[in-house]
């Protein structure tokens, strides 16, 4: 198999009007799903809302056009939230851009070295551990906006410090913000339940319109036309404007480059794992086989472009990819169209985005955290696996919350190797006896 072989080339053979219509429908629906998520995930990452949309548009387009999967949809994901927030806090936005560019280069090198098949061998206990840890971190990070709390200063980055601030400032709770947040959460939960139970023609509404869009619309209407008022994206980001993403080179300082090297590797590894996992899932849905090395190269190019055009790290998004397939997307054209639609939203609809209430964003992220938590897998490992696997799982989980993702992954790999060596030593001793 060739190292670089974009799927768009083979996908366009025999392309016709029927396939185009299916891709257009899927592209529009996925864009509708991605819009509120991209804004929410950027905020959760400590970036500006528009940066999430820049990422979905720029990286989403590049990766779809060059990628090794027919249907993978890329953009900002919850997995990056904690690491991106940490880089911004320690090295600023300039440091994040450098880390994103470096991660892009690392991903391209991994693809050229045919490392695509190797990355999928990351132990399941480690991926479940850090994914669950990220989910808890995201949940903790959104309590402030959900309750309308005032921290009287900069919001801390570490989850433990955030919990302390939440307790200290709980008296500043705004009941109006809480009510709006609960309305949003109720809509999201009800929409999810109804989407799984309603059949027939009525089910098309729930498939085509995500609950997050309904929650956003209701939230805006409540804040604009009732006495219930709370912080909005516009009130927290008054300088937020629309328009096309602008090209900008970061300021390369040696100390900053050195400081973000571990973060760049973490971003690259995480992007590779999540994107290739998304490819594997989508392969089963459409009975196809992706080119993992091509996907890594495209992922690298997409992250480089995202960094240069004001975005944050991007990777394949499993939920958006599944929505693409379920709504008829079968070629990279759907992913490209989804990116173009988001780009158009950036140009003409940003004033509407500024009206979105922050408790609604928090509610959306609560559901994102729940969906990515893998709590069933977590409990399953604790019930059925050996003690060594449980230690790796819990250690990775706790270190992701307490310290950061880089430390968690390294610790998980080291502990896994130690238990593997102990197992091999015991096997040799048993063989001698």
PLM segments and residue spans:
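Transmembrane helical cores of multi-pass ion-transport proteins
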Residues: 1-433
């Amino acid at each position: 198999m060739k190292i670089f072989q974009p799927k768009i080339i083979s996908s366009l053979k025999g392309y016709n009007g029927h396939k185009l219509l299916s891709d257009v429908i899927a592209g529009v629906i996925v864009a509708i799903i991605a819009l509120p998520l991209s804004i929410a995930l950027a905020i959760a990452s400590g970036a500006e809302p528009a940066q999430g949309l820049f990422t979905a548009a720029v990286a989403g387009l590049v990766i779809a056009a060059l990628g090794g999967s027919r249907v993978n949809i890329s953009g900002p994901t919850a997995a990056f939230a904690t690491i991106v927030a940490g880089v911004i806090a320690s090295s600023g936005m300039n440091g994040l851009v450098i880390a994103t560019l470096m991660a892009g280069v690392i991903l391209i090198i991994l693809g050229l070295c045919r490392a695509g098949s190797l990355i999928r061998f990351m132990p399941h206990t480690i991926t479940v551990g850090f994914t669950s840890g990220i989910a808890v971190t995201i949940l903790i990070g959104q309590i402030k906006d959900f309750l309308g709390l005032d921290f009287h200063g900069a919001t801390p980055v570490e989850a433990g410090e955030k919990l302390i601030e939440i307790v200290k400032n709980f008296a500043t709770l705004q009941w109006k913000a809480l009510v709006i947040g609960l309305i949003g959460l109720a809509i999201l939960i009800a929409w999810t339940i109804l989407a799984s139970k309603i059949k027939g023609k009525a089910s098309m509404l729930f498939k085509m319109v995500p609950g997050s869009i309904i929650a956003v619309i209701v939230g805006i209407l409540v804040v604009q036309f009732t006495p219930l008022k709370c912080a909005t994206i516009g009130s927290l980001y008054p300088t937020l404007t629309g328009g096309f993403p602008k090209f900008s080179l970061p300021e390369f300082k040696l100390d900053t480059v050195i400081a973000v090297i571990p973060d760049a590797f973490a971003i690259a590894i995480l992007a590779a794992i999540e994107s290739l996992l998304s490819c594997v899932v989508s392969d089963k849905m459409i009975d196809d086989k992706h080119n993992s090395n091509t996907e890594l190269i495209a992922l690298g190019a997409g992250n480089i472009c995202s960094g240069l055009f004001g975005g944050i790290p991007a990777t394949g998004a499993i939920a958006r990819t599944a929505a693409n397939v379920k709504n008829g997307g079968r070629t990279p054209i759907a992913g490209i169209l989804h990116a173009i639609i988001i780009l158009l939203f950036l140009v003409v609809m940003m004033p509407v985005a500024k009206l979105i209430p922050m408790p609604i964003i928090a509610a959306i992220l609560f559901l994102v955290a729940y969906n990515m938590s893998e709590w069933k897998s977590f409990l399953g490992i604790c019930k059925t696996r050996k003690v060594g696997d449980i230690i790796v799982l819990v250690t990775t989980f706790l270190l992701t919350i307490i310290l950061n993702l880089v430390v968690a992954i390294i610790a998980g790999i080291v502990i896994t190797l130690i238990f593997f060596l102990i197992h091999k030593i015991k096997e040799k001793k048993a063989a001698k006896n």
